[in-house]
């Protein structure tokens, strides 16, 4: 985990200075390894969430599912990441008709590279709910460090439109 002094974004994480997104490799549901390069040329909505099929994570995933067509129309792809295994992801995806990619990061390598691991309530450590908007050139353009699951999808659509108009 980065020390406080080496983070490349503001403490509030609301408006980062664009910087290269950390490369990653993670397993998809079909067992193939996906990397950041697989998404080059598209905007990526990369979101980290604590656990499949829990209340907040389900609300967030369904919020993104419901606006996926709007996100796709903006040339973006949604990618969700947690430490859950492929079997858990498959059940979560089927139960809630999720229409986007889910990646498994059981060893937390990608999660930690994106600084989505840290202290949570009551001093416990775990996966932090965070979303990164990555440009087609692989630059992190926006970080949501404190995500409210309800309505997050609409928030992402509005921000993608704003970034693309700039």
Which stretches of residues belong to each language-model region?
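Chalcogenol-based redox active-site neighborhoods
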Residues: 2, 8-166
């Amino acid at each position: 985990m980065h020390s406080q002094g080496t983070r490349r974004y503001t403490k509030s994480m609301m408006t980062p200075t664009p910087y290269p997104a950390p490369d990653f490799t993670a397993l998809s549901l079909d067992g193939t390894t996906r990397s950041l390069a697989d998404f080059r040329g598209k905007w990526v909505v990369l979101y980290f969430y604590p656990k499949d099929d829990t209340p907040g994570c389900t609300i967030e995933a369904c919020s993104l599912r419901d606006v996926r067509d709007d996100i796709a129309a903006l040339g973006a792809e949604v990618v969700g990441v947690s430490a859950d295994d492929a079997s858990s992801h498959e059940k979560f995806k089927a139960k809630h008709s999720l229409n986007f990619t889910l990646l498994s990061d059981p060893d937390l390598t990608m999660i930690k590279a994106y600084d989505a691991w840290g202290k949570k309530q009551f001093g416990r450590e775990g996966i932090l709910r965070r979303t990164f908007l990555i440009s087609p050139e692989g630059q992190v353009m926006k970080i949501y460090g404190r995500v409210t699951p309800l309505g997050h999808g609409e928030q992402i659509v509005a921000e993608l439109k704003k970034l693309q108009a700039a």
